[in-house]
Amino acid sequence: MIWAALTVTFYSITAYGDKYISAKLTCTPEEYTFFVSLVTVFWLALCLPFTGWRLGMDRYCIFFLVCLVVWKVLEFYTTAILLRHMEPYELKAWLGINMILSYGINLWEGKSSFRVSILILALCLLTGIWLILTDKKRASGGMGKYIAVCLLYIVSKFMYGLQMGKMARYGNSVSILILVLLIVALIQLPRLPRRKLPAGKEMTGVILSRLTNAAGLMTEAEAAASNIFFYTLIQPLQLFVLFVACLITGRPMSRKKRAGSILCVAAVLLSSMALL
């Protein structure tokens, strides 16, 4: 359980670090993608003496690497855009849809049986997301464009996870991540706007947020190896922790948004436990 608890802690800190980079430093999607990728590579490289470098190359591996780069760029861009207008827990609530999608794929492949309870919880999750979306403070602006970016975020996360699983036969996760994120960072170089880049305390915040991300990647692997039950609960527990943190810090929240948020958190937690 300790590994899962550490992972939730590290990833929750990272989520606020992402919010800091995107909203506080007002980084463009290109800047956000570059900083997040490059600094994460730095911390992951320090882990190589413990994990080793293992990555076999053939044409299928190269194809999957290209796909991972595409999905990771899309994930970072959408994250940078969304975190300017939403709290970190809201972003995690959207990821609950991926859990339902995974369940649907397992149904299609005959790996799971149909459960009415999961369908009800999926409807609760979608209802909660809709309540948050239609909150009066978010009503102004292009709702359609906002939803489109959220859906792109979900697709990028889902496809990245799916193809990362297929890459496991070619090497360890640290080696794959270093190569993918390094390519992502290099792609952003020509696209970086010409302005003064973060430095001093601002850059320290960026570096520390990636340290917790790298640490979370390590403890997540340990959690998966030690206890699959607690590993499965990492995502819903992180959503719960981020929501509680939002309440404790007194972030403005209407009754409608609060109700939708509680519905999302409950639906994701119960769905995770039901699918074990």
Where are these regions (language model features)?
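Alpha-helical transmembrane segments of compact multi-pass small-molecule transporters, enriched
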Residues: 39-43, 94-109, 183-187, 215-219, ...
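Loop-to-transmembrane-helix transition segments
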Residues: 1-7, 35, 45-48, 54-78, ...
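Glycine-/small-residue-enriched transmembrane alpha-helix faces in small-molecule transporters
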Residues: 1-30, 120-121, 127, 139-174, ...
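C-terminal ends of transmembrane helices
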Residues: 14-25, 73-90, 129-140, 187-198, ...
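Structural motif at transmembrane-helix junctions in multi-pass transporters
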Residues: 24-31, 77-94, 111-113, 168-175, ...
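Hydrophobic transmembrane alpha-helices of multi-pass small-molecule transport proteins
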Residues: 41-44, 97, 101-107, 116-135, ...
